[in-house]
Amino acid sequence: MALKDTFKNLFNYFEVDEVNEVEEQADAYSMPNDRPKMRVANTTVAPVREQQPKVETRREARSESQLQRLHERQQELMTNNNEKEIVKTTIDIKFPKRYEDAPEMVNLLLDNASILIDFQYMSEQQARRCLDYLDGARSVLSGNLKKVSNTMWLLTPVNVTVNIEELRNAGTTTGVADSNFEFDIKR
């Protein structure tokens, strides 16, 4: 509207004779106001006052609903934290019998599971092949692969640390007689 008035005033500046005609046209379209000006001002102000409390109540309702949702979310997070404390870590024990069982163990590693692998049911050549495959997967997934015994290996995801020194120290304190048993018992 202001832009339109600016252009009218610009044209009116150069055309002095038509200014009176424009003012006369504006007067012809205006309606005479029978009511007093004070009464008109009161009626226009009253609806504005009624709309403002409605907006405030909407805002209050929004803030109350947001507070309620926030409270519910906090309760949900608290229950989730309690459940996380209860969850125990498990280690899957696998006895692969052939090389084709290796991808299954890699899938467990992808699911952040720790796997204790016992190669006692595989030939030495297949066990080395399988171990090579698992070592490649471990390096790609940034996991850990530790030797536990002659035929057992522990494959863990990146978020699990293994302190193998305690296991080695425990093996040396048992005595010389236990270290002579290097054969595996087949089940």
From Swiss-Prot:
GO terms for cellular component: cytoplasm. It comes from the Bacteria. Keywords: Cell cycle, Cell division, Cytoplasm, Septation. One of its GO terms (biological process) is division septum assembly. It holds the Pfam family SepF. It is found in: Cytoplasm. Cell division protein that is part of the divisome complex and is recruited early to the Z-ring. Probably stimulates Z-ring formation, perhaps through the cross-linking of FtsZ protofilaments. Its function overlaps with FtsA. Homodimer. Interacts with FtsZ. Belongs to the SepF family. This is Cell division protein SepF. It comes from Streptococcus suis (strain 05ZYH33). The gene is sepF.
